Curated annotation (Swiss-Prot):
Cofactor annotation: Mn(2+); Mg(2+)
Record EC number: 3.1.26.4
Binding annotation for a divalent metal cation: D21, E22, D112
Enzyme class (EC, first level): hydrolase
Span of domain RNase H type-2: 15-193
Name of the protein described by the UniProt record: Ribonuclease HII
Note describing how the cofactor binds: Manganese or magnesium. Binds 1 divalent metal ion per monomer in the absence of substrate. May bind a second metal ion after substrate binding.
Cellular-component GO terms for this entry: cytoplasm; ribonuclease H2 complex
Primary role: Endonuclease that specifically degrades the RNA of RNA-DNA hybrids.
GO molecular function, one term: RNA-DNA hybrid ribonuclease activity
The keyword Cytoplasm belongs to this UniProt entry's keyword annotation: yes
Alphabetical list of CDD domains matching this protein: RNase_HII_bacteria_HII_like
């Protein structure tokens, strides 16, 4: 059964609604990236869904369409700040900054997950990237942005295979850490590191 990805946008049809999602929260290395997107409820881009369910090629195409047609913003919190304030607070900060940087002020903010925000406009939706078109669009922007950053870092540290694992704890990545030690981009606060 296909889910109506506009159910939340329709529920809040009288409001300016932004969707927010992050990429990189579970990674061992690099930044966490959050994106906020306000979709055009009349001009819906076809094919938008949770970024994890799309091929890299399809994500790249949708990234260009979303960034060309919708209001969007991205915020990046670097690994050093993640180590200072913890990954949850860094993720919340990235989400808040992404929303603040939008050129339109949203009245309702749909965010993937179960995070709690002091700003009452935030509405946390578990599995939101599969339930809201705005959140799904934000997931695409966040993932493509972070993946591109990790490809740049991979050129500096090719031994960690970030061009394949994007900093996540794959077997090959763990083996590379055991062989080469930590890079300057690894999150030192993570238990593994």
């Amino acid at each position: 059964m296909e889910v109506n990805l506009l159910q939340y946008e329709q529920k809040y049809h009288n409001y300016i609604v932004a969707g927010v999602d992050e990429a990189g929260r579970g990674s061992l290395v690099g930044p966490v990236v959050a994106s906020a997107v306000i979709i055009d409820k009349v001009d819906i881009i076809s094919g938008i869904k949770d970024s994890k369910k799309l091929s890299k090629n399809k994500r790249d195409i949708l990234y260009e369409q979303i960034t060309s047609n919708y209001v969007w913003s991205t915020a990046i919190i670097e690994h050093t700040e993640i180590d200072d304030i913890n990954i949850l607070e860094a993720t919340k900060k990235a989400c808040t900054i992404a929303v603040a940087n939008l050129s339109l002020k949203p009245e309702k903010i749909l965010v993937d997950g179960n995070m709690k925000f002091s700003d009452v406009r935030f509405i946390s939706i578990i599995n939101g990237d599969n339930l809201s078109l705005s959140i799904a669009a934000a997931s695409i922007i966040a993932k493509v942005t972070r993946d591109r950053l990790m490809l740049e870092l991979s050129a500096e540290y090719p031994q960690y295979l970030w061009h394949k694992n994007y900093g996540y704890g794959t077997r090959e990545h763990i083996e590379a850490i055991n062989t080469h030690g930590l890079s300057s981009y690894h999150r030192k606060s993570f238990k593994f590191c």
